[in-house]
């Protein structure tokens, strides 16, 4: 089987958020992704819920994806790109989803949601519960290893996962690119089988890039190729296809939480 990766978290669309700031950088990011084994990536624009959200946000993402697809075809870059959002959590997230202002990864049941780094456990739990109360919505917690409450109490992830949430860690976190606390937390979550997938959270072509092959090597060395394939291809592929992903089965053999 040819090795390839699915990246569900990137900021590759130009000038829509703090990611790529021009078309040239977007093309460079696509070249890096395709050249290092990524077959498909999701264009997850930041959607800041502290600002008014409208259907214009979704339209800009869809138009950006269409533009990027045309450019990739013109440049002969073998990369599939799909629409998505990285949604900043808010107390009214449930109503915004119901109104159709927010959508999941490739319009699937899987909604990528992020929180302020200093968000307390109770607030995160409330937002996740609000999302899960909607039939067919599965929260995917973006980079939980970067949240202070998870760094201080990583066992909390176990309860969110067992409630039906998924988790996406950043490749750069367990490589130490964000700092020691993020690295230690990411590795503890990985060791406990509480990470659903790994993504790049790419923002540029030179610093936070869409390279996933180094993550594959490190995961393979630490856990075996089967685990690397699960986190970088199989689980993300189920998300973009809107297929069922049984998270309780993923953590089923953790009989006692190993982080104490």
Sequence positions of predicted segments:
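Active-site environment of divalent metal-dependent phosphoester hydrolases
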Residues: 48-51, 88-90, 146-150, 174-177, ...
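Non-catalytic positions within long, well-ordered alpha-helices that form the structural scaffold/packing
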Residues: 34, 132, 190-191
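Short acidic/histidine-rich active-site segments
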Residues: 46, 194-210
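Mid-to-C-terminal alpha-helical segments outside catalytic/metal-binding sites
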Residues: 212-260
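Active-site neighborhood of phospho(di)ester-bond hydrolases with catalytic His/Asp-centered motifs
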Residues: 6-8, 42-44, 82-85, 140-142, ...
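An N-terminally biased module of ancient metal coordination in phosphate/nucleic-acid-related enzymes
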Residues: 1-77
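Extended substrate/RNA-proximal surfaces in nucleic-acid metabolism proteins
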Residues: 52-168, 246, 250-260
């Amino acid at each position: 089987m040819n090795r390839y990766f699915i990246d569900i978290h990137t900021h590759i669309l130009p000038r829509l958020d703090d990611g790529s700031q021009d078309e040239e950088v977007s093309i460079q990011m696509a070249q890096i992704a395709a050249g290092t084994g990524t077959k498909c990536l999701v264009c997850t624009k930041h959607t800041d819920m502290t600002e008014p959200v409208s259907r214009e946000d979704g339209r800009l993402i869809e138009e950006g994806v269409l533009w990027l697809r045309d450019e990739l075809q013109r440049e002969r870059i073998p990369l599939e790109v799909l629409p998505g959002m990285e949604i900043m959590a808010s107390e009214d997230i449930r109503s915004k989803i119901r109104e159709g202002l927010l959508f999941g990864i490739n319009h699937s049941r899987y909604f990528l949601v992020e929180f302020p780094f200093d968000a307390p456990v109770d607030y995160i739990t409330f937002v996740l519960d609000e999302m899960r109360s909607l039939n067919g919505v599965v929260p995917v917690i973006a980079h939980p290893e970067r949240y202070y409450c998870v760094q201080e109490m990583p066992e909390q992830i176990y309860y969110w996962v067992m409630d039906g949430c998924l988790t996406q860690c950043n490749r750069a976190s367990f490589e130490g690119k964000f700092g020691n606390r993020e690295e230690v937390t990411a590795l503890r979550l990985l060791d406990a089988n509480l990470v659903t997938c790994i993504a790049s959270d790419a923002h540029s072509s030179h610093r936070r890039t869409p390279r996933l092959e180094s993550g594959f090597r490190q995961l393979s060395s630490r856990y075996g190729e089967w685990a690397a394939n699960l986190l970088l291809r199989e689980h993300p592929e189920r998300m973009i296809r809107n297929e069922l992903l049984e998270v309780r089965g993923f953590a089923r053999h953790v009989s006692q939480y190993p982080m104490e």
